[in-house]
Amino acid sequence: MKKTVSRLLALALTAALVLTGCGGGGASEGESGSTGSSAEAAEGEITDLYIPRLLTRELETFNILYSQRQEDSENLTNLIDGLLEATPEGTLEPGIAEEWGSEDGGKTWTFKLREGVKWVDVNGNEKADCTAHDFASGMEWILNFYKNDSANTSMPLEMLEGANEYYEYTKTLSEEEALALTAEEGSPFSEMVGVDVPDDYTITYTCITEKPYFDTLAVYQCLYPISQAMVDELGGPDAVQAMNNENMWYNGPYTMTSYIQGNEKV
């Protein structure tokens, strides 16, 4: 991955976010779908992102599934890609998903994912493919009481078949039992919740009733992915809650190579 060295000098009242491009962003129209992780940056390609910000609140978490704070979202959505993106005008554009739609009035939504998207570490080293299983793992995390502690649960609880039942089920377990749950085939999540992964690059969400606007919600953090392989590498859910820019995995256009609370993000 092409990297450029970025530096940020924090001023007394102004901070800035400089994120190093990792070349793994969404493919534009006409591209093959490859992330181009080994290719040189094209002429004119943005490799550094600079966002001036007043020094207010800092990041509380690097787990995009856990937070609904604007400060966290502004940073983390540049590091992690979800299914879809929205323009300032509200138009939906492909993210990890390159095709999506419903054939039954919005009761069931299917998203076809782009192949070749990689999870990478802070140095741009490839760790794993980003697949539909990661989006299922993300939803399991959201609906697991002990993993998520009620953050970002309202939309899936109200919309997805079996979501509320699974959330209540996890509350009946011990913390140790609940933290050990995954979204793997044959798991309680896969049996109870309306999230199906028929292959590595297809994920289907089944709603309680017809939701013709469900795709507009696919930009929200509650539908973001998490790699179970990363969870395992870090040592489990507790370690994910405590992860930082140095040990998290990225699948978006930028990595955060340096983070100093209240001072610097590079």
Regions flagged by a language model, labelled:
Residues 1-50, 62, 91, 133:
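Short, low-complexity disordered leader/linker segments with a strong preference
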Residues 45, 58-67, 91-93, 119-121, ...:
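Short, solvent-exposed loop/turn elements at domain surfaces
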Residues 46-57, 108-112, 135-138, 203-205, ...:
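Short, well-ordered beta-strand elements
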Residues 52-104, 249-255:
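N-terminal lobe/hinge region of extracytoplasmic solute-binding protein
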Residues 56-59, 88-89, 105-106, 114-116, ...:
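Solvent-exposed coil/turn segments that connect beta secondary-structure elements
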Residues 74-78, 82, 91, 95, ...:
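Extracytoplasmic/secreted proteins, especially bacterial periplasmic and envelope-associated proteins
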Residues 98-162, 204:
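Aromatic- and charge-enriched surface segment that lines or borders ligand/interaction sites
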Residues 176-182, 189-193, 200, 206-266:
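Gly/Pro-rich hinge or "lid" segments in bacterial periplasmic/extracellular proteins
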